[in-house]
């Protein structure tokens, strides 16, 4: 889901070769295929087994640099932070039996109730400085009602009610903001039973948990356990912590300068993505990583709705704009 960034990164390397620029620092292109599966066979493999090939002061990665409209104003979020993961399995035990005789301790029913509680709950709110700055910056450049509503989302006593109202009118915006304010857990897979007329003795579900930077695995699991109840056994499948990088760097300044030239009037703003990228792996080598895969968008395209959707796509003109923008950043920074 980031073939545009792969192409732009490769093209930047090709352009550096074609133009014969004199490099003042190494320029490394790394392409791997398993970020969606946890990065174990890709970025983590490179970091752990071949660190000399990918050791760098800075990394430019996916998710950032796309146009975000608030009214008539344009913003360009630059990813400086991302959540960690906790992929886990929920298991509920029950008494097996014949399907013709319903049981109150049916493991499938009990798991369903636990999943419903998890799906309906909002875990506790934890405001991060990068998220506070992001929402306040958007508010300052937005018309009413966003100008008033966005800062109120930082106050837990108002946030839940406002998000529920926002979900009825702008669902994608609501779920995106909600995921920036708290740890989240989305059930994605279920498994129970082998035969239609047999009540199984156990039922399982897999859940995609995302943890805010600064929150521990133990804190997250405690939040989830309080919601699903003590009868649910939780087993962690995979986990890594979230990351946050300093935006006060020469590379970040270069990105802002180029964006100002490529789209005067647009406002760069650091932000946190609710997902994760390979940046968490490269951070283990001390790299400062930014999500910057620029794409210029029109006001009618909901870009984040494309992620993992039925029709993932980007506009061709926006891609061409992004290719030139990324090259300008790379060229200016490495020469």
Predicted segments, located by residue:
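Short, conserved micro-motifs enriched in small and acidic residues
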Residues: 1-7, 36, 105, 313-320
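Acidic/histidine-rich catalytic neighborhood of metal-dependent amide-processing enzymes
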Residues: 2-77
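Short glycine/serine- and small hydrophobic-enriched flexible loop segments
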Residues: 11-18, 113-117, 328-331
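A structural signal for short, well-ordered beta-strand segments
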Residues: 29, 90-92, 207
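Acidic-enriched catalytic cores of C-N bond-cleaving enzymes acting on peptides and small amides
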Residues: 51-58, 64-73, 78-87, 99-190, ...
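Active-site-adjacent substrate-binding region
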Residues: 115-124, 140, 145-147, 161, ...
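C-terminal substrate/ligand-recognition segments
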Residues: 192-227, 240, 244-259, 268
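Zn-dependent metallopeptidase/amidohydrolase metal-coordination segment
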Residues: 241, 265-334
């Amino acid at each position: 889901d980031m073939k545009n960034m792969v192409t732009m990164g490769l093209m930047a390397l090709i352009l550096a070769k074609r133009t014969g620029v004199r490099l003042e620092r190494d320029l490394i292109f790394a392409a791997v295929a398993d970020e969606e599966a946890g990065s174990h066979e890709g970025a983590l493999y490179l970091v752990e087994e071949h660190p000399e090939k990918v050791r760098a002061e800075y990394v430019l990665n996916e998710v950032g640099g796309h146009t975000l409209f608030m009214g008539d104003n344009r913003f360009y979020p630059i990813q400086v932070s991302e959540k960690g993961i906790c992929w886990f399995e929920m298991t509920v035990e029950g008494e097996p039996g014949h399907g013709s005789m319903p049981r109150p301790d049916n493991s499938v029913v009990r798991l369903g109730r636990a999943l419903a509680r998890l799906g309906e709950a909002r875990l506790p709110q934890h405001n991060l400085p990068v998220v506070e700055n992001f929402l306040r910056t958007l508010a300052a450049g937005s018309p009413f009602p966003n100008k008033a509503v966005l800062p109120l989302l930082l106050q837990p006593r108002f946030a839940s009610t406002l998000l529920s109202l926002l979900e009825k009118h702008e669902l994608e915006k609501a779920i995106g903001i909600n995921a920036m304010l708290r740890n989240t857990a989305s059930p994605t897979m279920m498994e129970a039973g082998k035969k239609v007329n047999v009540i199984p003795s156990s039922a399982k579900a897999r859940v995609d948990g995302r943890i805010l930077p600064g929150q521990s695995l133990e804190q997250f699991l405690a939040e989830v356990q309080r919601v699903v109840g003590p009868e649910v056994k939780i087993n962690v499948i995979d986990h890594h912590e979230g990351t946050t990088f300093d935006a006060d760097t020469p590379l970040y300044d270069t990105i802002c300068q180029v964006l100002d030239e490529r789209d005067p009037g647009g406002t760069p703003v650091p932000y946190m993505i609710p997902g994760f990228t390979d940046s968490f792996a490269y951070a283990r080598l001390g790299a400062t990583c930014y999500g910057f895969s620029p794409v210029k968008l029109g006001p009618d395209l909901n870009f984040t709705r494309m992620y993992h959707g039925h029709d993932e796509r980007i506009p061709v003109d926006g891609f061409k704009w992004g290719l030139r923008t990324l090259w300008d950043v790379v060229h200016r920074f490495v020469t």
